[in-house]
UniProtKB/Swiss-Prot annotation:
Role played: Reversibly transfers an adenylyl group from ATP to 4'-phosphopantetheine, yielding dephospho-CoA (dPCoA) and pyrophosphate.
A GO MF term: pantetheine-phosphate adenylyltransferase activity
Subcellular location, record wording: Cytoplasm
Species name: Alkaliphilus oremlandii (strain OhILAs) (Clostridium oremlandii (strain OhILAs))
Gene that this sequence comes from: coaD
Annotated positions for site Transition state stabilizer: 17
Name of the protein in its database record: Phosphopantetheine adenylyltransferase
Keyword annotations: ATP-binding, Coenzyme A biosynthesis, Cytoplasm, Magnesium, Nucleotide-binding, Nucleotidyltransferase, Transferase
Domain of life: Bacteria
């Protein structure tokens, strides 16, 4: 069985993330959306809240599950017997950072490939940080995030 991991902070998940999930789910037998716990960040939503928000969005994908982790991605991936890491790219600036990470990950675990997926054009401007900033100042994020996330963010701000 081909297992792929789509890691991220997903604080919050956006329609761009869901675009990558939908497309990546067609490329593997099992896709694990892995919510990263980063102790150096101060997230809007807790790890468990982010996991639940994502689970509410992925019900139509029988081969997609959600998990949480902290630590080295490649150690986590080996434990899940993954063969690929999925990374979404919006722009060249994403590629520069993600290429460096992919090369390090390849060095740590040569048997696991990194697969880059370009975000669909209509989502290429979206980022979780931008969503939070717009919402914080009262701007509309309608159509940029799933309905459950829209409700959670508007309740938070």
């Amino acid at each position: 069985m081909k297992v792929a991991i789509y890691p991220g902070s997903f604080d919050p998940i956006t329609n761009g993330h869901l675009d990558i999930i939908e497309r990546a789910s067609k490329m593997c037998d099992h896709l694990i959306v892995s919510v990263i716990h980063n102790p150096n960040k101060n997230p809007l939503f807790s790890l468990e809240e982010r996991k639940l928000l994502i689970e509410e969005c992925i019900g139509k994908y029988a081969n997609v599950t959600v998990d949480c982790f902290s630590g080295l991605l490649m150690e986590y991936a080996k434990g899940k017997e993954a063969t690929a890491i999925i990374k979404g790219l919006r722009a060249i600036s994403d590629f520069e950072y993600e290429l460096q990470m992919a090369l390090m990950n390849q060095r740590l675990c040569p048997s696991i490939e990194t697969v880059f997926l370009m975000t669909s054009t209509e989502y290429s401007f979206l980022s979780s940080s931008l969503i939070k900033e717009v919402a914080k100042f009262g701007g509309s994020i309608h159509g940029m995030v799933p309905a459950n996330v829209y409700k959670a963010i508007t309740n938070r701000f």
